[in-house]
A protein has these predicted regions:
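Cyclophilin-like peptidyl-prolyl cis-trans isomerases
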Residues: 1-172
Length: 172
């Protein structure tokens, strides 16, 4: 199986490509592919950026509170699922609330290593090109809630599945 490749095209023309690891977190990848295929992320922003840590996006409301209207089970060790992908620079992972089964659509991309997140969040991909775009996003000026003063808009988010089909995710 060839891993799917997601392309995030920013409103300013920057582009990042991310390889998704279906063998590492299969339901998480199905969820992400499903949302991308439906155009869910088009026009959303990276609403939370923290230098030395990560950039977070995927909230349709743009304030950190939104999602797709459902959640999925967290595919990580603390939740009883083997996932050995470490939260190193460039890794893609699902954001969630305190509940380990609360991930929906919000995701984050690591701009620095964060081993304290390992086994507690569902890592499921890695940036393969365009890490410079992530670095530019994380360097933008923010308010006291880590929200960029100038919105960092994902103009278009697409996925290439190389002919592989992905079922809808299992929802909690």
């Amino acid at each position: 199986m060839t891993n799917p490749i997601v392309t995030i095209e920013m409103e300013d023309g920057g582009e990042t490509q991310i390889e998704l690891y279906a063998e590492t977190a299969p339901n998480t990848v199905r969820n992400f592919v499903s949302l991308v295929s439906k155009g869910f992320y088009n026009g959303t922003t990276f609403h939370r950026v923290i230098p030395g840590f990560m950039i977070q996006g995927g909230d349709p409301e743009g304030n950190g509170m939104g999602g797709p209207g459902y959640t999925i089970a967290g595919e990580f060790a603390m939740n009883g699922f083997h996932n050995d992908l470490k939260h190193t620079r460039g890794v893609l992972s699902m954001a969630r609330a305190m509940d380990p089964n609360s991930a929906g659509s919000q995701f984050f991309i690591m701009v620095e290593d964060a081993p304290h997140l390992d086994n507690q969040y569902a890592a499921f991909g890695r940036v393969i090109t365009g890490m410079d775009v992530c670095d530019r996003i994380v360097a933008t000026r923010t308010n006291f809630r880590d929200m960029p003063l100038k919105p960092q808009v994902m103009k278009s988010v697409t996925v290439e599945t190389f002919g592989e089909s992905f079922d809808e995710p299992e929802k909690v």
